[in-house]
Amino acid sequence: MKLTISILFCVILTLQYNGADGKLKDLFGKIHDSVHGTADKVKEDLNSLFHPNDKNQQGNNDASSNIHFADSEENTDAAKKPDEVTPATTTTTTAAPAVPNAPSDNPTTLAPSTTTKDGRENFSGGCVAGYMRTPDGRCKPTFYQ
């Protein structure tokens, strides 16, 4: 650990000063450029290895492979203009108006509820997996731990 720190200290100390012949000047810039040049070359090699036909497809100037769009309406047989459609006529009949709040011959009354329920009996949902419904409507686990 001490050796690594001392070597790093010496390298930083020597990189601050320019050498007499200028070899140390812009050392990091040269390393940066060489790494980027190597990375670009590797990228181009991988592209040519996995996609060998990309350059051929980019330079393809065949007239049969080009797509042309029609500019005029003269040659548009595929897209026909829609025919004129007449809308259907609707007839309405008026019925006799109903009299609001008319007295009824049969009076209706609600039958009183004879049983009191707490709501669980009317629950129609199921229980989650591993639970079963009890007679009173609750969900209890099937296996007690």
Curated annotation (Swiss-Prot):
What domain of life is recorded for the organism?
Answer: Eukaryota
Q: What is the effect of changing residue 126 to F?
A: Significantly reduces plasmatocyte spreading activity
Q: Which Pfam families match?
A: GBP_PSP (PF02425)
Molecular function in Gene Ontology? cytokine activity; growth factor activity
Disulfide cross-links: 127-139
Keywords of the record = Amidation, Cytokine, Disulfide bond, Mitogen, Signal
Biased composition, Polar residues: where in the chain? Answer: 55-67, 104-116
Name the reported effect of residue 136 to E/L/N.
Abolishes mitogenic activity and reduces plasmatocyte spreading activity
Q: What induces it?
A: By parasitization and low temperatures.
Q: Where is this region: Disordered?
A: 46-145
Listed InterPro entries: GBP_PSP
Asked if the Swiss-Prot or TrEMBL record annotates the protein with the keyword rRNA processing, the reply is no
Regions of biased composition (Low complexity) lie at 85-103
What positions are modified (Glutamine amide)?
Answer: 145
User: One GO BP annotation here?
Assistant: positive regulation of cell division
* Task of the protein: Biogenic peptide that prevents the onset of metamorphosis from larva to pupa. Has repressive activity against juvenile hormone esterase. Induces cell proliferation at low concentrations and inhibits it at high concentrations. Mediates the spreading of plasmatocytes to foreign surfaces. May have a role in the regulation of dopamine concentrations.
The protein here is known as: Growth-blocking peptide, long form
Q: Which organism is it from?
A: Mythimna separata
